[in-house]
Amino acid sequence: NKNGYIVAERGDINRVDKTFSISKTYLSNVVGLAHDKGYIRDVHESVGSYMSTDHFVSDHNSKITWDHLLRQTSHWQGTLWDKPDWADRPPKDIPWTELQTQPLYEPGTFWKYNDVRVNLLALSALHVWRRPLPQILKKYIMPIREMMLKRLILTIH
């Protein structure tokens, strides 16, 4: 609304919408903040050096960096919380029985969206912060978002 006129509309403003991709936005903020604070020294460093689990010990997974996880180019291989990476968004043209034997791409060379790998990024960030990520969001990210929203509202009026 500007000077009493509606300048744009999109969708039903009273309807609740699902926000599927918000986790990637928050995770990139949390990881970026960890880097800014020195908790992550270099985004091109192996994530495995920050973990006390075996998620990054294989020859392939040990090459995966924060940058690879953030860009979804890690091609991490494994199982997280009973869900194997290959079971998430499998290609339609490959039989289910052959999914486990697909070739691995070198980290950083192949992009593929994968919920298991997004969850792995969240687990990795949790290992860095050593406290629940919602606490990090509440303390560091949300106050900035609220300030920006207030500034935007003041600018519009």
Q: Language-model segments: which ranges?
A:
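Short, conserved catalytic-motif segment at the N-terminal edge
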Residues: N1-T19
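Active-site helix/loop module of the DD-peptidase/beta-lactamase fold
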Residues: K37-W76, Q100, W129-H157
